[in-house]
UniProtKB/Swiss-Prot annotation:
Keywords: Coiled coil, Cytoplasm, Cytoskeleton, Lipoprotein, Myristate, Phosphoprotein. Residues 1-41 are annotated as: Disordered. Highly expressed in duodenum, esophagus, pancreas, prostate, salivary gland, thymus and urinary bladder. Residues 48-272 form a coiled coil. Belongs to the CCDC69 family. The keyword Metal-binding does not apply. This is Coiled-coil domain-containing protein 69. GO terms for molecular function: microtubule binding.
Length: 296
């Protein structure tokens, strides 16, 4: 404003020096030059006012351009800071998840080793028990065979002596004894085959038990893995929800700060331009589109 007054004062034509009237001469009538002089002064004032308005408009445009540039720089800086913060959070989450996965893996390894030791111990006990059963049955079979052999020998000896005393010829006796021995051998063979079938059945049952134990161990391991994955998914979803809430709160704070900064700039611009001067270009307020853009 001060420049305007100085400009107007500089644009005024210079005043003519007044000459003192001579007392001897009668007063002369003033020339009629007031009208043209006032017209030139009005034109000069209008030109100065238009130049001042043009300069004022340029100042407003420059201030608005500076405001837009500062707003863009501020938005870019906020976006970079937000990206860095999100990247740091993601790195921290990755480190935390890796630590948790490592701990869970160690726990699974420990439980797997314990289960492996328990199953190995139970398998050894079952194998030793079955081996003891097989050895006991084998010894019983051998003892039975030895006993039958002794009984047969004693019976054969007694019958042979008695037959010789009664008949004097051993041929018929040997035929009868051979038939009885053949019958006994057939019975023993059937008994042996029965014991063999039982042993084979026990081996088959043992193999099936081992296969079932392996399947149970595999299913338990898969069940534990599924439980661990579900717990990790729940923890990750909760963490992401918390991060989303924190990001929204930070975004709201940034939007409030931006509005406050914009309001301060508008007040400063209002003070610079004056209370009566209205800017030709209105300031762009914070729109919901910009907020959603920052949120994404």
């Amino acid at each position: 404003m001060g420049c305007r007054h100085s400009r107007l004062s500089s644009c005024k034509p210079p005043k003519k020096k007044r000459q003192e009237p001579e007392p001897e001469q009668p007063p002369r009538p003033e020339p009629h030059e007031l009208g043209p002089l006032n017209g030139d002064t009005a034109i000069t004032v209008q030109l100065c006012a238009s130049e001042e308005a043009e300069r004022h408009q340029k100042d407003i445009t420059r201030i608005l351009q500076q405001h837009e540039e500062e707003k863009k720089k501020w938005a870019q800086q906020v976006e970079k800071e937000r990206e860095l913060e999100l990247r740091d959070r993601l790195d921290e989450q990755q480190r935390v998840l890796e630590g948790k996965n490592e701990e869970a893996l160690q726990v699974l390894r420990a439980s797997y080793e314990q289960e492996k030791e328990a199953l190995t111990h139970s398998f050894r006990e079952a194998s030793s028990t079955q081996q003891e059963t097989i050895d006991r049955l084998t010894s019983q079979l051998e003892a039975f065979q030895a006993k039958m052999k002794r009984v047969e020998e004693s019976i054969l000896s007694r019958n042979y002596k008695k037959h010789i005393q009664d008949y004097g010829s051993p041929s018929q006796f040997w035929e009868q004894e051979l038939e009885s021995l053949h019958f006994v051998i057939e019975m023993k063979n059937e008994r042996i085959h029965e014991l063999d079938r039982r042993l084979i059945l026990m081996e088959t049952v043992k193999e099936k038990n081992l296969i079932l134990e392996e399947k149970i161990t595999t299913l338990q391991q898969e069940n534990e893995d599924l439980h661990v994955r579900s717990r990790n998914q729940v923890v990750l979803s909760r963490q992401l929800s918390e991060d989303l809430l924190l990001t929204r709160e930070a975004l709201e704070k940034e939007v409030q700060l931006r509005r406050q900064l914009q309001q301060e700039k508008e007040e400063l611009l209002y003070r610079v331009l004056g209370a009566n001067a209205s800017p030709a270009f209105p300031l762009a307020p914070v729109t919901p589109t910009e907020v959603s853009f920052l949120a994404t």
